[in-house]
């Protein structure tokens, strides 16, 4: 299984604000991995089993993970990326987890082939290789969300306190 994360650059979040609730995503620039450029629905699972579906109109849609990651690192908006793609950038502070108390459904990786009968030996070796090596690599790329998510939560609290101080002043 592959965990998806909502991520953005600290630069973008400092400028546009850190969403505290999934509904606030509609007020942000989003970049999406989708065939449908017009609409996108992100389903988030929150504390105590809450489920929220947020309809968005992404500014950019495509299937190129490295391009989307590069764009969000440069401050273009918020996107959903597989943890395996963005974990290192989150660890080193280039990206920040958005809505750290909420999660996205996990994706599942499948190897699909027509039939075992007539399966080329090279294909069988490749499938066996994936079955052996992919799960440990996925596990190694998992974020210890304790650190990264706690930093994101602290920034959300700090921005909320800053907004309260401005309102009170």
Q: Language-model segments: which ranges?
A:
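Short secondary-structure boundary/capping segments
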Residues: 21-23, 32-34, 51-52, 87, ...
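Secondary-structure junction motif
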Residues: 29-48
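Short loop segments at secondary-structure junctions
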Residues: 9-12, 36, 47-48, 115-117
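Flexible hinge/capping segments at coil-to-helix
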Residues: 1-3, 7-31
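Hydrophobic hinge/microswitch elements
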Residues: 53-97, 104-105, 124-127
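Alpha-helix N-cap/loop-to-helix initiation residues
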Residues: 14, 37-38, 105, 119
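C-terminal effector-binding regulatory domain of bacterial HTH transcription factors
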Residues: 83-92, 102-169
